[in-house]
């Protein structure tokens, strides 16, 4: 039997949806490739994160990776990932998230086939001031000239990439349906009042202020935020419950026993929580941003909203007959947004490059 080709993933943002994406993709590809993951631990990274990975996957922590720009740490991370790659001698390198993408594209000369997935460009993040966003875009523009293919995780992100480089493609994010279904099957379904939920860190990106406004406009509806974060004080409406940080099975239990998934984000890549909610046949009501609007088509498989009033109206509609919407969303995940489809498309691109 021929020796498996070595693939090295370099991941700085190992938390939230990116963590789930990396776990699902690596676990799916390990049957075909010898998988190595060089990563950084974040606050959102599960404490038992190693248990999520197939035992055949090699995990290597990058000690100097950090989210913020820090010249000393970033230079140290540059040499650290070069050393890791020199020891592994991978046949292909795939960089994930903006920080890994910037450092990695400078660190490697392109002799080894290299891919980069932004998972949401940093220059689109509205919590950064305009000057900082211009710097982030300049960094992406310079790095885009390197010998590297950018693979975006949604059509919208791909359109942004094409403004930077033509060496680009996209593969839609996908979810592990089998693993999710297993958790759903083990979850007790309980009677509950009409419930709207969201999932993730309570931070500027996820727009808790808008979530609170929507809840205040619908005092007869129960709202649940699955997660925690620095802006939890923004969630003041009396009909909002905050779960705090919970494990995956508990988060799914909350979701299963709810009716509508709301995602009022200011920006997104292609959210895993949205795809999982579509699979669970929840009515999905999302903001009109890249990622969300690539998956949800207004009135066909959910609702896309541009104002608090539109969110409120959509949730009111969701209290009526919605089976056609939720069934279409479910079928979309079965056909397009699942790990098997995603892994097969990546495998094809890897094979063409090695």
Task: Mark where each language-model region is.
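A conserved mid-protein helix/loop that constitutes part of the nucleotide-sugar donor-binding site
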Residues: 19-24, 194, 198-217, 230-233
């Amino acid at each position: 039997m021929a020796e498996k080709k070595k693939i090295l993933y370099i991941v700085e943002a190992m938390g939230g949806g990116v963590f789930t994406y990396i776990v699902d993709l690596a676990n799916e590809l390990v049957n075909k490739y010898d998988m190595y993951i060089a990563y950084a631990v974040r606050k959102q990274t599960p404490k038992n994160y190693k248990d999520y990975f197939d035992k055949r996957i090699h995990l290597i922590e990058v000690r100097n990776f950090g989210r913020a720009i820090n010249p000393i740490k970033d230079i140290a991370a540059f040499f650290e990932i070069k050393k890791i790659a020199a020891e592994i001698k991978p046949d292909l390198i795939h960089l994930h998230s903006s920080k890994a993408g910037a450092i990695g594209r400078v660190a490697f000369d392109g002799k080894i086939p290299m891919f980069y997935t932004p998972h949401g460009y940093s220059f689109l993040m509205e919590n950064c001031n305009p000057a900082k966003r211009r710097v982030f875009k300049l960094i992406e523009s310079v790095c885009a000239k390197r010998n590297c293919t950018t693979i975006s995780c949604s059509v919208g992100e791909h359109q942004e990439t094409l403004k930077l480089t033509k060496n680009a493609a996209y593969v839609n994010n996908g979810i592990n349906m089998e693993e999710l279904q297993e958790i759903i099957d083990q979850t007790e379904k309980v009677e509950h009042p009409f419930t709207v939920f969201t999932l993730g860190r309570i931070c500027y990106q996820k727009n808790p202020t808008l979530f609170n406004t929507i809840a205040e406009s619908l005092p007869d509806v129960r709202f649940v935020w699955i997660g925690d974060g620095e802006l939890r004080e923004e969630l003041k409406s009396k009909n909002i419950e905050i779960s705090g940080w919970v494990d995956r099975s508990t988060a799914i239990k909350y979701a299963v026993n709810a009716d509508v998934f709301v995602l009022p984000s200011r920006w997104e890549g292609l959210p895993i929580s949205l795809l999982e909610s579509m699979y669970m046949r929840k009515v999905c009501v999302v903001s009109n941003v890249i990622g969300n609007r690539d998956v949800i088509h207004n009135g066909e498989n959910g609702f896309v909203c541009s104002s608090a009033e539109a969110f409120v109206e959509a949730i009111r509609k969701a209290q009526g007959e919605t089976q056609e919407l939720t069934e279409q969303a479910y079928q979309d995940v079965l056909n397009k947004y699942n790990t098997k489809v995603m892994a097969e498309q990546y495998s094809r691109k890897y094979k063409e490059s090695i």
